[in-house]
Amino acid sequence: MPSISINITLAFTAALLGMLMFRSHMMSSLLCLEGMMLSMFILSTLIILNTQFTMSFIMPILLLVFAACEAAIGLALLVMVSNTYGLDHIQNLNLLQC
């Protein structure tokens, strides 16, 4: 495995560990999620370019579309929660609260 793939895999792992460690605040979770999506995009693009599999050139573009939708929904949810509660804690998203 080339060193660039190892570095991108380490970036994905670091973003995943950041997501697990800083899961109490929504903004840090969204940033870690974006880091994971970016590393997945770069890794999938490198794999497609190395294997020259022409039928899957659309996959990185679809991944970017889903990442943009995820970011937009996440930021809208962050604005809604911060306007309602004044905090960005994920514990405010509990649907069982009355």
Swiss-Prot record:
Principal cellular location given in the protein's record? mitochondrion
Q: Where is the signal peptide?
A: none
Gene3D superfamilies named in the record: 1.10.287.3510
Q: Which domain of life is it from?
A: Eukaryota
Any one Gene Ontology molecular-function term assigned to this protein's record: NADH dehydrogenase (ubiquinone) activity
InterPro entries from the xrefs? Answer: NADH_UbQ_OxRdtase_chain4L/K, NUOK/Mnh_C1-like
User: Which parts of the chain span the membrane according to its record?
Assistant: 2-22, 29-49, 61-81
Q: Which GO terms describe its cellular component?
A: mitochondrial inner membrane; respiratory chain complex I
How does the UniProt record describe the way this protein sits in the membrane?
A: Multi-pass membrane protein
Can the keyword RNA-binding be found in this entry's annotation? Answer: no
Q: What is its EC number?
A: 7.1.1.2
Q: How does it assemble?
A: Core subunit of respiratory chain NADH dehydrogenase (Complex I) which is composed of 45 different subunits.
Q: Which family does it belong to?
A: Belongs to the complex I subunit 4L family.
Q: What does this protein do?
A: Core subunit of the mitochondrial membrane respiratory chain NADH dehydrogenase (Complex I) which catalyzes electron transfer from NADH through the respiratory chain, using ubiquinone as an electron acceptor. Part of the enzyme membrane arm which is embedded in the lipid bilayer and involved in proton translocation.
Protein name listed in UniProt: NADH-ubiquinone oxidoreductase chain 4L
